Amino acid sequence: MMWFDPANPEVLFGDQRSETVTVTDRSHRTDGTRTLRIEPDALLDFRALPFADGAFKLIAFDPPHLTRAGPRSWMAAKYGKLGPDWRADLRQGFAECFRVLATDGVLVFKWNETQVKVREVLALTPHQPLFGQVSGRGGLTHWLVFMKPRAA
């Protein structure tokens, strides 16, 4: 989804699902559908990453950001949806990212604050971003960059 070259051997794309879904949306296709393919290299849960401490120098963390979505929502089908314990899930996700991140490693975090403000999410981790960029329609998508400190 964010990768320019999903076949790059230096990249490991993980998701908790592997599926192909056809959804109805306002696409420009004549039949009004869109086919989504979620094809991760590894099935995993960001709350319990199956990697050794310090295994990665760079991590891109792009968790689901929707708390509400209809049963046929293409956004939920594409990006996933947060569960009722989303605060605990994201807190654990940040902890796991920093656990498997090498010292001085970089975490790139992407968040869209249409439903949950980025400040609420940042309150779930003791780490502060070094810098970031706001993008997207309405300036709601945040790209934040963290670096794992030596003492973390």
What are these regions (language model features)?
Residues M1-A152:
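Class I S-adenosyl-L-methionine-dependent methyltransferase catalytic core
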